[in-house]
Amino acid sequence: MAELLQAAKAHAPGRESDPGRASIEVVAPLRIDLAGGTLDLWPLWCFHPGALTVNVAISPGVRLRLVVDDRLGGLIRHRAPDGRETLLRPLDRGQNLTAAVGFHFRPEGGVFIDVRDQPTVGSGLGGSSAYAVALARACLFVAGRRVAPTALVDCLKNLEAGVLIAPTGVQDFWPALAGGPLALSFSPGGVRVERLATPTAWLADRLVLIDSGIAHASGMVNWEVYRARVEGSRTTTRALEAIVTAAQRCRDALLAADEEGVGEAVAADWAARRTLAPAVAPPAVEAMIAAGLQAGALAGKACGAGGGGSIAFWTPPLTRAAITAAALQAAPAGARELPVATVGRPPAVRIVASN
């Protein structure tokens, strides 16, 4: 395997150029979940009629390039943003998301995947799902195939669950595929994807995003919630009902461009969410949120499953700088502000180099 990797490096295109071969570039946004997260896990939404999730697509997200290279002998060559390379075989599908998605959509392998941008693991911004979307779109493009969005999301959800060995939802895939802001409504008939007419610039002006530097494992946090609800925990049931109400309020407030209403809904979502499991709101996360609120934020929450990762604040535009400074001061060493550019629709797949 090591010899084959060296041979692939010698013959495959470098990062700076791609002479003689078409290089397909795909960009997939990340997301900030404002309200209703966790409800996208089946069958949790079946227990809570009216369940919906409201999120915003943001960049920078995942950016990768894919080159077909039959000299790889049916393997997948993966290069991470830090330059580390791995050769993947079909047998790796159960432990590696690149292999799971890549070999599903291109069973014959023979591709070089050069990941240019990707969030750190545990960001809470749906990075693994955005990566899966980007890779699937690239593979489908080179194959000349189309898959309906709902079918693609269902497939990627199942592939990701197989790698994580944990329940997975759908809310992270949709912003990566369709942009935002979105309201995802869940019913026995499926998922209804509603694109909200709220201007993306209005949203970006009111969002602050901080990488807390605190590691978390979304799959395990979600499993705690999943198990507690299925086992009939009254605390978890009440919290999820409150999250349903908060998400409905958030959608309505976004459609009305009601700054305070959105803040109240996001705050209500976090107040309920932090009671779902002990791991959702560790003291370091609570300290950052409290500091942001004291500095003038209307609401703050840990993104995704919580427990660490990224902390989002909803705030009047004029207080963004003060909230950022306060949250960083209260954060552990290594925390940093993340840029927030909201995304209406992801860019199309493009050919960036060809002969």
Regions found by a protein language model. Give the residues of each.
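Residues at or immediately flanking beta-strands
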Residues: G110-F112
